[in-house]
Amino acid sequence: MIDRTELSKFGITTQLSVIGRNPDEQSGFVNPPLYKGSTIILKKLSDLEQRKGRFYGTAGSPTIDNLENAWTHLTGGAGTVLSASGLGSISLALLALSKAGDHILMTDSVYVPTRMLCDGLLAKFGVETDYYDPSIGKDIEKLVKPNTTVIFLESPGSGTMEVQDIPALVSVAKKHGIKTILDNTWATPLFFDAHAHGIDISVEAGTKYLGGHSDLLIGLASANEECWPLLRSTYDAMAMLPGAEDCQLALRGMRTLHLRLKEVERKALDLAAWLGNRDEVEKVLHPAFEDCPGHEYWVRDYKGSSGLFSIVLKNGFTRAGLEKMVEGMKVLQLGFSWGG
């Protein structure tokens, strides 16, 4: 059996085969069992009174622990908390690092539900949000206010696909004592190491590539040493944990994540190149293409590209024509998710 303290010396294939598994604690079975339940039997009255250890189903389970520990290893963070969706993890991260009277700088290319969270719930709680150009780089310093507590990044951006200059943004944040949150769903930890690049909290919708089969909803948030207590205490207060079955499916998906990402990358690049030669297409927005905004940062910072990209159609395309095209497709279908 591999010594887990030396696991990082091995390749990613070996690591993904080992993390989240503890045969010695499971009667020799390779995969962890599925733990479902709400009530947990405690031996002492003092344990019940002090909420010591695992005292109720909302405090997690061995199934959840296995996935959290595996993701912490993969991200290099100090700890991980799970939630029932990617948006749930984004919410946890923002709530952990902001309070009434604080100011957040949010990339203008952010996932629309994240924008709705900021403009709705957080605004109601007294948190101010300003949106910045995702290509701003070090000039974001001009937007920093005395009460700015968070810079939120999403790279590449939703729809518009700009790759951000993450080291430049992190440098400004650290200079002013501001925390950084990155939505790393597109790249996953395999293609971008968020914490190694100075990000404080990295969030991901595991619904996409970690699950990979369109049959689960799960979010993950990993934090560095400084932000981990804040993230964990926020999670404990809100009990936003996912279902046990989704955790088990996510653990299964983790075993083949590296294989699926590479195949997704290959197929997406082929499709993007084909679309780029179509008369109807004005531009393909794919971070691996030289004319994509921030391509140089993708080359510098990323280890690969995943499957999500955008196209810009030439002028003259009507709504009716677009409907005819997308509703007439036989293999590619309309839907709000990707990666499955």
UniProtKB/Swiss-Prot annotation:
GO biological process, one term: sulfur compound metabolic process
Transmembrane keyword on record: no
Keyword annotations from UniProtKB, A to Z: Amino-acid biosynthesis, Lyase, Methionine biosynthesis, Pyridoxal phosphate
EC number(s) given by UniProt: 4.4.1.13
Cited PROSITE patterns: CYS_MET_METAB_PP
Cofactor annotation: pyridoxal 5'-phosphate
Modified residues (N6-(pyridoxal phosphate)lysine): 208
Listed pathway(s): Amino-acid biosynthesis; L-methionine biosynthesis via de novo pathway; L-homocysteine from L-cystathionine: step 1/1
Highest taxon of the lineage: Eukaryota
Signal peptide start and end residues: none
InterPro entries listed in its UniProt record: Cys/Met-Metab_PyrdxlP-dep_enz (IPR000277), Cys_b_lyase_bac (IPR006233), Cys_met_metab_PP (IPR054542), PyrdxlP-dep_Trfase (IPR015424), PyrdxlP-dep_Trfase_major (IPR015421), PyrdxlP-dep_Trfase_small (IPR015422)
GO molecular function per UniProt: cysteine-S-conjugate beta-lyase activity; pyridoxal phosphate binding
Reaction catalyzed: L,L-cystathionine + H2O = L-homocysteine + pyruvate + NH4(+); an S-substituted L-cysteine + H2O = a thiol + pyruvate + NH4(+)
Extra remark beyond the main annotation: Present with 2610 molecules/cell in log phase SD medium.
Family: Belongs to the trans-sulfuration enzymes family.
Protein name as it appears in the record: Putative cystathionine beta-lyase
Species assigned in the record: Saccharomyces cerevisiae (strain ATCC 204508 / S288c)
Lineage, uppermost ranks: Eukaryota, Fungi, Dikarya, Ascomycota, Saccharomycotina
